[in-house]
Amino acid sequence: MTDKTSLSYKDAGVDIDAGNALVDRIKGVVKKTRRPEVMGGLGGFGALCALPQKYREPVLVSGTDGVGTKLRLAMDLKRHDTIGIDLVAMCVNDLVVQGAEPLFFLDYYATGKLDVDTAASVINGIAEGCLQSGCALVGGETAEMPGMYHGDDYDVAGFCVGVVEKSEIIDGSKVADGDVLVALASSGPHSNGYSLVRKILEVSGADPQTTELDGKPLADHLLAPTRIYVKPVLELIEKLEVHAIAHLTGGGFWENIPRVLPDNTQAVIDEASWQWPAVFNWLQQAGNVSRHEMYRTFNCGVGMVIALPAAEADNAVALLNSLGETAWKIGAIKASDAQERVVIA
């Protein structure tokens, strides 16, 4: 009988020991995110979570997202520490606009070859995002898939579940003529428009690490983590009447604000009410991007738009600013049957 070389999973490119080492590295930070409703620890086949007892008619709200090609930029610049915050932000910000409190979060991390340091850095960021949003990181999947990804390249996806009282769901149905729109400032491009960002970098020849903008490298502006609005927005909802909230993600102003507008209403945005942060001016100029395309692709300094009764607007701005946000009145709702749902003037 001919001797054959004994093959192992590691020979095929999957290092189970590296996966176990990663779990050991992240246990501590994951534990910090725990909520009282979570039952059991990491490592079960499924994560168990009870519903908070304060809800009379709890409705679960779920969401999933990624960070798009911002990830490519982070990999190229070898900066993995905040991409996990982006991942959580993209999910929990989508939940809170419906009035939901995030409960738990799971992540999926896929790579061709598992680099424990890189993966731990990403998951530390995920845990930080969960802490910022009061959400428990209850589990995840780390998939090492040789032949599927080039080298140390990786991709991430997030999944979040939240809860809202049925009678307090925010769905935009109460939006009315005369409502005031309040903006929450973004921290940068957040996690949208990065294919255009990368194209602008390519065409302009700008090196994000050596190009200075407002006293710091362009890379710092581009990789600034997506702002998580959960805690201040939940406090706003608790204290004041809120009719609708739009999270400005892919599609920018033109596509996200109409998602929360009832028929026969139009959002009128006052362009003079704020100044674009420097990074958006740089992107527009370096890429010769039209104003319409900027508002369609990027948040242009506005992370969320909140519609509420005019009588609540000043109180809302004051409350949000007291909670550490930068908030201002950005426009109003008017009755209109025009096809154009958003006007920026």
Curated annotation (Swiss-Prot):
Keywords: ATP-binding, Cytoplasm, Ligase, Nucleotide-binding, Purine biosynthesis. It comes from Cronobacter sakazakii (strain ATCC BAA-894). GO terms for molecular function: ATP binding; phosphoribosylamine-glycine ligase activity; phosphoribosylformylglycinamidine cyclo-ligase activity. This is Phosphoribosylformylglycinamidine cyclo-ligase. Belongs to the AIR synthase family. Pfam families: AIRS, AIRS_C. Its EC number is 6.3.3.1. The lineage of its organism: Bacteria, Pseudomonadati, Pseudomonadota, Gammaproteobacteria, Enterobacterales. NCBIfam families: purM (TIGR00878).
